[in-house]
Amino acid sequence: MQYSDEHLRYLRLLSQKYQTVAAAASEIIRIEALLRLPKGTEHFMSDLHGEHEAFVHILNSASGVIREKIDTVLGNGVPAEERAELATLIYYPNQKLPELKARQKDLHAWYRMTLLRLIDLCRFVSSKHTRDHVRRCLPQNCGYILDELLHAHFEDHDKDQYYGEIIESIIRYDRADAYIIRFCEVIKRLAVDRLHIVGDLFDRGPRPDRILDSLMAHHQVDIQWGNHDVVWMGAAAGSPLCIMTVLKTTLAYNNLDTLEGGYGISLRRLERFAQHTYADSDVSRWLPHADQRTAAGDLTAAARMHKAVTVMMLKLEAQVIARNPDFDLQGRDFLNHIDFAAGTVDYFGTTYPLLDCDFPTVDPANPAALTADEEKIAAELVRSFAESERLQRHVQFLYAHGAFYKMCNGNLLYHGAVPMTEDGAFAAIRFEGTARSGKQLFDYCDRRARQGYSAPAGSPARLAGQDFLWYLWCGAKSPLSGRSAMTTFERLYIADPAAQVEIKDPYYRHIADPRTAEHILREFGLSGEGSHIVNGHVPVRAIEGESPIKGGGRLIIIDGGFCRAYHRRTGIAGYTLVYNSRGLILRTHQPFESVDKAIHEDEDIASKSEYIYTAPQRILVRDTDEGGRKQALIRDLTALVEAYQSGVIAQGVAQEM
């Protein structure tokens, strides 16, 4: 066999890890065994909007996968009430275990029964994984015993006796609680191989920061950014406009816990400024939306702060629009179109009276200019966002594990829309002198979003990238926005409902056509009946009969209303998607009451499941992206074995096994 210099150089590098024929052959055999296993389960969630309790419950339950496995393994011999208790124990072991223990008359017997049930369940869940993979999922401090309990063979000894003796030792030495908790964590870890979050972790919900903590602890997760995410990314990067934008949403819902409690960002200077500047203003239009889960506090103070940041946001929007003609947002720099003496705004050729004419910080001769006090507030907030270590860790995680879109195992994942023309062609959007559409546009947006955080501080490239992050939040042709405008100004200042309409991109009309879904998949290099688009962003109005399944089954929108504010609009509390070795399952969830009720009343989220794609045969690891990479490694290892055997590369010294 002839070897190119480059191929030989690569094989020599590979030989450093696999130093003998035996080592390379053993790895080939191990990989071939792995490739024959069923593919792991993938779990898709979208549009979490800060609803951390519902998110954590669905994450812990794997969208009902764990309860299904409990019913499969224990359904014949264990009452439904006890299966529900076991499910809650697995979801919330640290909280549920003390409650269950307190109820027991014979704690020793309960420990034994619970450990045996968890062993059976864990053996079942681990059956589609190699033993090596399962071992790597086990905690170090008790991994050996867990491995023995999961993989013991009973040809030579009695199963009940073997388990019984180990369990007796665990109970005798007061380790039962620790082993129960470890089994629960391992079951959750093995039930789902990979988690996909299709955008919008942030928004009005109480604690998006806690969602990110959970994601950072997850074993394998990827994120497709949503419009609410990129504006927080811009805020963390140092964009004053993105900061005012996230503050406006936060104050509109009186959700200061995320900023002050979660990220340690003080709003005291802003509060003092707002209380002084708008002391005599009517702020009734600026009162926060009610949410019983957020601290009430001084609602009038919150309203003044809400108005203060909105005015600063409008000024900064006008500045960004002026320095970015590419954005094509002229006309949305509203402060430049207000007649302050008359109290009216020229809205794209129509004059409207303003609902609020009080602008004490605006200079009619230069309406986009911040006052000296506003400049100080903006500078302090930029510094506070930059110095929040937790926020910076979270945003770095979003950049490291996130992207504008992802292709995984034949599926295409993105949050918003692929901009289209009225006739269904990909819309060409011009930035920096070049028109881009489809995949090229997505790749460009990904690069510019990263530029806003990673370009050198103070550089023109970083400033331009931060402006672009804001554009992605609300721009008329932003794939993450997918609408003609974000009508924040219109809803606050103009009474006419016609001005408040946000027109959806033609994409949302065309995705009903299977040809559109197939066209998008081809644009990203995907094809075949097993390829699907997983989309978020726009709540599906299930209550009105709308289906989340579009394009002849090729596109699935999984935003069904995680956000509590959308429950009345959608009639449900969200969709999740499960992709296992047999196909794609869409789960429709009803509203989640609370973690407290789930723990103490074993109340699970009511869900219904629907197979939307059934694979013609069971999907194996060899059929996945990882399988393709493993098969490429087998080819390389086979070439290495041949190089050893032909004397082209010398074998190393065999290591003792």
Q: What are these model-derived regions, one by one?
A:
Residues M1-M657:
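Feature recognizes metal-dependent phosphohydrolase scaffolds
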